[in-house]
From Swiss-Prot:
InterPro entries for this protein: Amidohydro-rel (IPR006680), Metal-dep_hydrolase_composite (IPR011059), Metal_Hydrolase (IPR032466), Urease_alpha_N_dom (IPR011612), Urease_alpha_subunit (IPR050112), Urease_AS (IPR017950), Urease_asu (IPR005848), Urease_asu_c (IPR017951)
Domain Urease: 136-572
Protein name as annotated: Urease subunit alpha
Residues that bind Ni(2+) 2: 224, 253, 279
Organism: Haemophilus influenzae (strain ATCC 51907 / DSM 11121 / KW20 / Rd)
Keyword Hydrolase annotated: yes
Length: 572
């Protein structure tokens, strides 16, 4: 005999289902569940008097020798994912990877259990009924200035850091490069202790090929070209030749001063080859005043950095001071002041908001400690999405914000993974990928995760007083969990390296314990492959007024006085 309960009772017990709307933090964004993969009446719920018990939703006979038995299951969770959509399901994990999105349980007593999602005595369970699951974020613009950045990143929901540097040296303060084989080895060894996945850029500024090849052979997953080292056409061509030869990505911070050519000269040097452009609006650096036009090319993978996201009343003033520090400028030198002023343009920053909302800008990143904040990639993404809804209205006619939500979450999950040849392993919650999963309470979505899971093991979480009788008493703050302790750190995070480095077995050569995974497919991607962010309109910039037009239409917006996900979340 079937039991009928009210929708309110169902949601209170098992979480929202198809058609229910969930507000994301204190934004004006509402996510509506599109599909529920669970069987009504057979939902798995752990706890006293609940269903995950021996002989009920937990098999009484299945051992871990059975490859269909899970190590970890997150039940009844709402998933927000650029590839899967906005759905309700159980997430099954085994051997550190996602093996199922569907219905977990005991096939001896339940119908419609997904074949490889058996709950047994070997399975840990986490109730996700009132949580949102997202893929761990990927930040592709890291200045590795201090190792403490990794803690702030993972506490914000970012689980993969890609960039370069050697610590607080001036070269690293300004540029995201780990120069040379010796430093590459040292940085891999240092990053063994970090609880996040890591990939390093070599220095791409060299007009001959062998100095670039040796860095890739030493482990660099890509090359970074930076204007402070000279972003000349010869350098660009050399880096891209080596990239095509060795299947790695090239990231570029172009020539703000137009010393060796203008944007058109840079695009001519790129010559249709795929490239990842950093802070493509230009405040972070790049051809003044029209680097933003690079976003219209099909071979350009355009990214933003978070200090300009979104455009607020304080954005301009803050940038001038940051720029002076990061690029070793002097306010007493007129040429330095002119350099700074040329990079900070309200008109192009305003346009950047809209280009993100249109899907023209495809990736969000931080520019950590070099004008950007490593812990604010996720926050700034959703603040931009909210601002655009308030200023531009809904996208589409769905009666919800699902398309906008999927467009924006793609910017810091799947799209940076595609750009750097690692989408086979991370960037979404699709089956087969590493189980880097972030769980959020809806009221804290985008700001403060509940739990961060790395490779199937809880690594960071909000945790109360360890001496308390239960986990929740104050003070509650982020603490490293067992997945970020001892030898487990090497088992819950990976290094992304070049194929040449993997072939050379740098893991053994450098004495590393973390798994190394080779990037691949970096040279055959284009903007068309970037999820929900593949638009390539014609962009023009007025050289005197800096006005930006898309297909002939002026695009601009007003700065805002306040943003969601802001001060009310950080009172203490």
């Amino acid at each position: 005999m079937a039991l009928t309960i009210s929708r309110a009772q169902y949601v209170a017990t098992y979480g929202p289902t198809v058609g229910d709307k969930v507000r994301l933090g204190d934004t004006n964004l509402w996510a509506t569940i599109e599909q529920d993969l669970l069987t009504k009446g057979d939902e798995c719920k752990f706890g006293g008097g609940k269903s995950v018990r021996d002989g009920m939703a937990q098999s009484g006979t299945a051992t871990r020798d059975n490859p269909n038995v899970l190590d970890f299951v997150i039940t009844n969770v709402m998933i927000i994912d650029a590839k899967l959509g906005i759905i309700k399901a159980d997430i099954g994990i085994r051997d550190g990877r996602i093996v199922g999105i569907g219905q977990a349980g005991n096939p001896d007593t339940m119908d419609n259990v997904t074949p490889n999602m058996i709950i047994g005595a070997s399975t840990e369970v986490h109730n996700g009924a009132h949580l949102i699951a997202t893929a761990g974020g990927i930040d592709t613009h890291i200045h590795f200035i201090c190792p403490q950045q990794a803690q702030h990143a993972i506490e914000s929901g970012v689980t993969t850091l890609i960039g370069g540097g050697t610590g607080p040296a001036d070269g690293t303060h300004a540029t995201t490069c780990t120069p040379g084989a010796w430093y590459m080895e040292r940085m891999f060894q240092a990053a063994e202790a970090l609880p996040v996945n890591v990939g390093f850029f070599g220095k791409g500024n060299c007009s001959t090929l062998d100095p670039l090849r040796e860095q890739i052979e030493a482990g660099a997953l890509g090359l970074k070209i930076h204007e402070d080292w000279g972003a000349t056409p010869a350098v660009i061509d050399s880096a891209l030749k080596v990239a095509d030869e060795m299947d790695i990505q090239v990231a570029i911070h172009t020539d703000t001063l137009n010393e060796s050519g203008f944007l058109e000269d840079t695009m001519k040097a790129i010559d249709g080859r795929v490239i990842h452009t950093f802070h493509t609006e230009g405040a972070g650096g790049g051809h003044a005043p029209d680097i933003i036009k690079a976003a219209m090319y099909s071979n350009v993978l355009p990214a933003s950095t978070n200090p300009t996201r979104p455009f607020t009343k304080n954005t301009i003033d803050e940038h001038l001071d940051m720029l002076m520090v990061c690029h070793h400028l002097d306010k007493r030198v007129p040429e330095d002041v002119a350099f700074a002023d040329s990079r900070i343009r309200p008109e192009t920053i305003a346009a950047e908001d809209i280009l993100h909302d249109m899907g023209v800008f495809s990736i969000m990143s931080s520019d950590s400690q070099a004008m950007g904040r490593i812990g604010e990639v996720v926050i700034r993404t959703w603040q931009t999405a909210d601002k655009m809804k308030m200023q531009r209205g809904e996208l589409g006619n769905e009666g919800n914000d699902n398309f906008r939500i999927k467009r924006y979450i793609a910017k810091y999950t799947i799209n940076p993974a595609i750009a750097h040849g690692i989408a086979e392993h991370i960037g979404s919650l699709e089956v087969g990928k590493i189980a880097d999963i972030v769980l959020w309470k809806p009221m804290f979505f985008g700001v403060k995760p509940e739990v961060v899971i790395k490779k199937g093991f809880i690594s960071y979480a909000k945790m109360g007083d360890p001496n308390a009788s239960i986990p929740t008493p104050q003070p509650v703050f982020y603490r490293p969990m067992y997945g970020a302790q001892g030898l487990a750190t090497a088992q819950t995070a990976v290094f992304f390296v070049s194929q040449a480095a993997e072939k050379a077995d740098i893991r053994a050569k450098f004495g590393l314990h973390k798994e190394t995974i080779a990037v691949k497919g970096c040279r055959n991607v284009g903007k068309k492959d970037l999820v929900h962010n593949d638009v390539t309109p014609n962009i023009t910039v007025d050289a005197e007024r800096y006005e930006v037009r898309v297909d002939g239409e002026l695009i601009t917006c007003e700065p805002v006085d306040s943003v969601p996900l802001g001060q009310r979340y950080f009172l203490f």
